């Protein structure tokens, strides 16, 4: 700023004292004298040696002077544009002011995909959403719990799709339904093919109506059947005399027998090997919503291919005004700018030193009318004139200092809702979450309709020998002649206990008696014991209370230690300790204990213990695909500080199951005080 003011003062001084050698810009020629930046060449009167001094360091910026009165408007000049001057030096930094908001910039290029963040915590369970469209068939899940469900209605058969291209040679399929007999062809009979592999054993058919057959002739003795299940011990018969063993007879001719009456259904055979996958059946009707047990978390998948860049997002909200940045480094010297407008006349500067005499130049053309000179002395005050027209707008002043921060304005009205943005690129699937709690066992879905018969497959290769077939139906042969009486045999082992008999008829009703001392709504005493009326409490009867009901929140507790039922339903007296799973008697008397457990995965064997000794056992044999239940109850006489708990006697039968929706519980209460 100080340098520019000095240059303007020198320029004005040259105009005043060197008017004889001044020419208009229109007829001015380029001078050979070089000057500092922003120094216009001009002719000088004196002659001397051309010298160029070194540019001194810029002085400190001076104080801002008062703004002068605008001078009178000059006549329009007709000057020719001068030569383009050298670029000026870098000006001082301006004052920092809050600028106006610029136009929003173009959306930036999509950034590179960032690193996967840390796994977040599991969020709260959301509300169930609306039912979505039916998705594609998924991978068969693990076998769920088989529960008897209500069969749904059979869906209509779907339309047959177009015939696909022939696939690769597959494994032998399940034999299809026999098709209709085709028309007689015209061809040479081919060679008989090799015998195919035996097909898988079909499902057991429904028992047919009893036929009326004729007894056929005895057939050849069949192969010895597989060892059957052990039957019930029969009545001991008379011992016969062992006869001599005869020679084996020759096999007779093959007899043609007639089918006899249908015998009773035989025992279930050995389950056959898993058959080949059959053709895909028609999609069944959607079943009831099940609550399946979530599977184990899968392996982390490979990183997918990089997706295409997304669409530009909507315009963001206006951010807060940033803090003015630090002064940047000096930029490169720019190109020469256009000649600026004529500045205001500056104040008279100090007279400069006399310059050296320059060379005499050629005579110039007569110049144009000079500019208006300095104003003369003040004249006599004249009469006030009429109000003139408003003058032209003055030049803008220098930017002022930054004002104080104003008060926060009132919040503006909400703007209009913007247009809906472009749908973003689908995100990448996150890592599988932790395994959730066991769900409610789902109901068994309905059996789907049979699939369409598949095309006959190509001839397969010879397979390995098959497993032995199921046991044949054992038929009773003709009774042979009684042999001679044999010697008495040794005493046999004791047979297994027989099945429990049917329940007996109910007994006659007993006579109701009212003990002496009984009063309705009050407690009574009998043989030194006090009993409490049903529905009465301690406040009415004066009898103390000791009761608890607890639930197991986690499945499969440890064996040979007390089971810790950790979820409390009622334990106001704190006689049950959930940390140890043990109930401690504080009031001597008769207690009633009951427990209800579930079995899943394996058998369950639970026992009720008193002071380290089992009082009663409960055993349940687990059936695959079902959720079994077992329960037990007992009345126990307890003294003070006696302890009662539930425990699994061994680790082999430890299938005790409990979850959020399937509860295993343990209860007890005092009903008579001794």
Curated annotation (Swiss-Prot):
> What Gene Ontology molecular-function terms does this entry list?
extracellular matrix structural constituent conferring tensile strength; metal ion binding
Against Pfam families, the record matches this protein to: C1q, Collagen
Q: What segment(s) does the record annotate as region Nonhelical region (NC1)?
A: 513-674
Query: Which portions of the chain have biased composition (kind: Pro residues)?
Result: 83-92, 499-509
Residues where Ca(2+) 1 binds: 620-621, 627-628
Cleaved signal peptide residues: 1-18
Which sequence positions carry the modification called Hydroxyproline?
A: 453, 456
Task: Report domain C1q positions.
Answer: 541-674
Segments for region (Nonhelical region (NC2)): 19-52
Compositionally biased intervals (Basic and acidic residues): 110-121
Q: Which InterPro entries match?
A: C1q_dom, Collagen, Collagen_Structural_Proteins, Tumour_necrosis_fac-like_dom
Broad class of the protein's primary localization: secreted
An annotated GO cellular component: collagen trimer
Q: Where is this region: Triple-helical region?
A: 53-512
From the Swiss-Prot or TrEMBL record, state where the protein is found: Secreted, Extracellular space, Extracellular matrix
Output the PTM entry.
Answer: Prolines at the third position of the tripeptide repeating unit (G-X-Y) are hydroxylated in some or all of the chains.
Annotated positions binding Ca(2+) 2:
628
Keywords carried by this UniProt record: Calcium, Collagen, Extracellular matrix, Hydroxylation, Metal-binding, Repeat, Secreted, Signal
Gene3D superfamilies for this protein: 2.60.120.40
State the residue spans of region: Disordered: 49-517
Q: Where is the composition biased (Low complexity)?
A: 191-207, 270-285, 387-402, 437-446, 455-482
PANTHER family per the record?
A: COLLAGEN ALPHA-1(XXIII) CHAIN-LIKE ISOFORM X2, SI:CH211-266K2.1
Summary of subunit composition and partner proteins? Homotrimer.
Tell me the function of this protein.
Type X collagen is a product of hypertrophic chondrocytes and has been localized to presumptive mineralization zones of hyaline cartilage.
For this entry, the protein name equals: Collagen alpha-1(X) chain
Give the species this sequence originates from: Gallus gallus (Chicken)
Lineage of producing organism: Eukaryota, Metazoa, Chordata, Craniata, Vertebrata
């Amino acid at each position: 700023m100080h340098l520019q003011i000095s240059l303007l003062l020198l320029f004005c001084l040259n105009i005043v004292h060197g008017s004889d050698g001044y020419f208009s810009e229109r007829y001015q020629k380029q001078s050979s004298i070089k000057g500092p930046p922003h120094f216009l060449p001009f002719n000088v009167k004196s002659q001397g040696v051309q010298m160029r001094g070194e540019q001194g360091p810029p002085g400190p910026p001076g104080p801002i002077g008062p703004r002068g009165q605008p001078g009178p408007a000059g006549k329009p000049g007709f000057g020719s544009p001068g030569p383009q001057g050298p670029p000026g030096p870098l000006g001082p930094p301006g004052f920092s002011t809050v600028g106006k908001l610029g136009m929003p910039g173009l959306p930036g290029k999509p950034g590179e995909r960032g690193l996967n963040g840390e796994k977040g915590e599991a969020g709260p369970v959301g509300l169930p959403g609306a039912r979505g469209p039916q998705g594609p068939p998924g991978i068969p899940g693990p076998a769920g719990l088989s529960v008897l469900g209500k069969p749904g209605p059979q869906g209509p058969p779907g339309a047959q799709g177009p015939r696909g291209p022939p696939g690769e040679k597959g494994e032998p399929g399940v034999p299809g339904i026999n098709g209709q007999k085709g028309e007689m062809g015209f061809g040479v009979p081919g060679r008989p093919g090799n015998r195919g592999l035996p097909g898988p054993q079909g499902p057991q058919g429904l028992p047919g109506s009893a036929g009326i057959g004729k007894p056929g002739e005895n057939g050849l003795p069949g192969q010895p059947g597989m060892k059957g299940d052990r039957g019930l011990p029969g009545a001991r018969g008379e011992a016969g005399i062992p006869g001599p063993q005869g020679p084996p007879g020759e096999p007779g001719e093959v007899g043609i027998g007639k089918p006899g009456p249908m015998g009773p259904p035989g025992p279930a055979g050995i389950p056959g090997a898993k058959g080949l996958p059959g053709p895909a059946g028609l999609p069944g009707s959607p079943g009831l919503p099940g609550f399946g047990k979530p599977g184990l978390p899968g392996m982390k998948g490979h990183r997918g291919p990089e997706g295409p860049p997304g669409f530009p997002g909507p315009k963001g909200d206006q951010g807060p005004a940033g803090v003015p940045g630090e002064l940047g480094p000096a930029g490169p010297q720019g190109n020469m700018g256009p000649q600026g407008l004529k500045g205001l006349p500056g104040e008279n500067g100090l007279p400069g030193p006399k310059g050296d005499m320059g060379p005499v130049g050629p005579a110039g053309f007569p110049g144009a009318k000079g500019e208006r000179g300095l104003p003369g002395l003040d004249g006599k005050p004249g009469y006030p004139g009429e109000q003139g027209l408003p003058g032209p707008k003055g030049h803008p002043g220098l930017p002022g200092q930054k004002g104080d921060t104003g008060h926060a304005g009132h919040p503006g009205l909400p703007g209009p809702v913007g247009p809906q943005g472009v749908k973003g690129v689908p995100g990448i699937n996150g890592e599988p979450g932790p395994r959730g709690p066991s769900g409610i066992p789902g109901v068994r879905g309905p059996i789907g309709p049979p699939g369409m018969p598949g095309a006959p497959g190509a001839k397969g290769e010879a397979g390995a020998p098959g497993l032995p077939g199921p046991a044949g139906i054992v038929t009773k042969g003709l009774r042979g002649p009684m042999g001679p009486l044999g010697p008495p045999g040794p005493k046999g082992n004791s047979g297994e206990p027989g099945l429990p008999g049917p329940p007996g008829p109910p007994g006659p009703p007993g006579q109701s008696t009212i003990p002496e001392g009984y009063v309705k709504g009050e407690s009574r005493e009998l043989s030194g014991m006090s009993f409490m009326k049903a529905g009465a409490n301690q406040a009415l009867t004066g009898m103390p209370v000791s009761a608890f009901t607890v639930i197991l929140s986690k499945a499969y507790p440890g064996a040979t230690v007390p089971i810790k039922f950790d979820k409390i339903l009622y334990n106001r007296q704190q006689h049950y300790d959930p940390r140890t799973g043990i109930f401690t008697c504080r009031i001597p008397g008769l207690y009633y204990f009951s427990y209800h457990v579930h079995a899943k995965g394996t058998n369950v064997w639970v026992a009720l213990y008193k002071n380290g000794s089992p009082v009663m056992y409960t055993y349940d044999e687990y059936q695959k695909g079902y959720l079994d239940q077992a329960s037990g109850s007992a009345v126990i006489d307890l003294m003070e500080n006696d302890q009662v708990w539930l425990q699994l006697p061994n680790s082999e039968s430890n299938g005790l199951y409990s979850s959020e929706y399937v509860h295993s519980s343990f209860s007890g209460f005092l009903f008579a005080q001794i």
